[in-house]
Amino acid sequence: MKNMFRGCLSLKKIELFKFDTSNVNDMSYMFYQCESLKRMDLSKLNTINVDNINGLFSECISLKFIDITTFRTRLLLQPERFIPDVKGLIYKHKSIKGIITCYK
């Protein structure tokens, strides 16, 4: 799924609940430069085998909400891997209202 939607500048919404991702190991830059994307619900994806989420949401400047409640990958402990400079992104763009994870 690496680069799958990369550069889809007009992509505003996508539902991925029918995707079988049980064997996917690379989701790097999957939504890179999806500048119109506002909400992303990845809670239905099976991510147990994913080992690369670098830049997953890089340059998604309109993104306001991300739901990754069922993401099952140790990489979530490092949010800077899928949202580079995660603190800077929130402060610079101020558009992200929330990231829901399974971790507390």
Regions found by a protein language model. Give the residues of each.
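Negatively charged
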Residues: 2-104
